[in-house]
Amino acid sequence: MNDSELTQFVTQLLWIVLFTSMPVVLVASVVGVIVSLVQALTQIQDQTLQFMIKLLAIAITLMVSYPWLSGILLNYTRQIMLRIGEHG
């Protein structure tokens, strides 16, 4: 495996990390803003409420997006293993 192939795989890995982390980050951000807005409007200043709602939203997002995430990661792993096997 030469340097250009290695650079290509690392670049592809960084894009995969970006795309697979994006759903969780977006959901956490949106839920955080909404909960903060509701807390400001109702003058409830309990931090555990925000934490628990975010945690629940992230868990649901991970459960829903798990097939997509695992498919992407498994395809990348297969691709890497095949390339390593070719150069054995």
Swiss-Prot record:
Domain of life: Bacteria
Entry keywords, A to Z: Cell membrane, Membrane, Protein transport, Transmembrane, Transmembrane helix, Transport
Keyword Cell membrane attached: yes
Cellular component per GO, a single term: plasma membrane
Membrane topology: Multi-pass membrane protein
Stretches that traverse the bilayer: 15-35, 55-75
Keyword match Membrane: yes
Disulfide bonds: none
PANTHER family named in the record: FLAGELLAR BIOSYNTHETIC PROTEIN FLIQ (PTHR34040), SECRETION SYSTEM APPARATUS PROTEIN SSAS (PTHR34040:SF4)
NCBIfam families xref list: fliQ_rel_III, PRK15350.1
Protein name per its UniProtKB record: Secretion system apparatus protein SsaS
